[in-house]
């Protein structure tokens, strides 16, 4: 059965949960995922899907709210991936993505969009976007892309740690 993240919260709450992410020593690793979308139904459905999979979703209804959250919220320090709608009122997704790529280059950004004009695709393609999720997407696709982004974040973080160690 194929499920999409365009579900009502009551349906999303009944979805089968994926196993949580675990660390090497068996302790729970709960990565934060920032969801930026002006559609409350999509934000809430994604929140349920990601929470059931063991992630800690942080929600923002606009680019401005997402930037403020990352600057002020202590939990934002643990953000391992960002899901950003491309078409939003006010600050559009391309502008938001450019901000996050400048200020948080280690965090992969996944673009969410139902239909994006070519100029947006060109703009985000030059900004190192991690991947693309076309709306509507199955929950499995969303989780696969998010897990891939978290894996990329962990690789970047590990690479940074190895660069910070003194040479012997």
Predicted stretch roles:
Residues 59-81:
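Acidic, metal-coordinating helix/loop segments flanking the phosphotransfer/catalytic sites
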Residues 40-58, 127:
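Two-component/phosphorelay signaling modules centered on CheY-like receiver
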Residues 68, 94-106:
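Short amphipathic alpha-helix used as the core "switch/output" element in two-component signaling
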Residues 39, 82, 86-87:
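The short loop immediately C-terminal to the conserved phospho-acceptor aspartate in CheY-like receiver
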Residues 119, 137-150:
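C-terminal output helix
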Residues 61-65, 89-96:
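Acidic catalytic/metal-coordinating carboxylates
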